[in-house]
């Protein structure tokens, strides 16, 4: 608590002299009017974000923050890029942290290095190392880390019991189960109707947070060699993870899996209709935010969470962490006010409320180490931060993600082999990465 309060206190002291932070081109910019804050987050996260804004405005009446929800996603920042290039961008934008490097390379983010060094030269030591690293590009800082998250396999206890499976098999004190064990469990749960369509499934590996990074890391893969300046989607571990996706979908039936997802998890599916909640899916890979979803929409559901299944017995568990950040888009005329708000929302007050209401873990070490902050049903996620991996911070991070996602679609549909699909990722991404070499 004291460390972040100190950070805010220092900011307030030096705020009057913050013209240095923006550079000469902004030194004469207007510091009047609202600070405009954009996010692409929808419910329930946007409600919590708006509450943080309201709390800030209540104690900072001189320059208020205007909360605006805009279209977008993790890698689709079209609205932001169009607005910045048209001179109508926001003052603060909530950006998926792993693509900070790419947006900095695109020239649409302000360099915040001087700001952070002036406010607190030791700020980097007060947040999770991987979160800080994701906020960097070529030795400069372009973002304030906000939240983080890790992943595990959730299991519906009642569905397991109904299939004659003792839920104790999932007890994480025993370590992760193997993928072969997972498949045997699922065969006892998978149920089809007279037309051959699934009405209940044990597990669909690409569902939820079953991304390329999830399974690539799980099979020991590496996605980039930063020293060599190479993306490495054909790394044997990544290929093995994609092969697992190919084989699982082939066994279940590619079309039957697609039919199930279309029926029980269509786009914009309300949270209360999540197939894990409705009793149509027994297990899924997902993140810590789901705990709050369960509490809100299925408080009586019996569930557990444990390590992502591993290829073979004795393998160490894996997970990966994501998370978001706050950035100042290029051209902001209210950088002083923007940074003041960013220090609040990314400080203890903002991160604490976001964790309590939305479930995403904080990046501030002071909060992560606070005794009693993590309730029992979230302690798994606190534990996994000790061994989590993170996506490589690349100036083509969004492009790489999208290319991997396309490859994953081709593989789960059994249209291409993993090697074919992942070679296309190299062909698409590496020439773009070459433009930014050397990376280190």
Map each language-model feature to its residues.
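Long, aromatic- and glycine/proline-rich binding clefts that accommodate carbohydrate-like moieties
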Residues: 126, 130, 299, 306, ...
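Extracytoplasmic "Venus flytrap"/periplasmic binding protein-like
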Residues: 55-127, 140-143, 161-169, 274-275, ...
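Short, polar/charged alpha-helical segment
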Residues: 42-64, 158, 404, 422
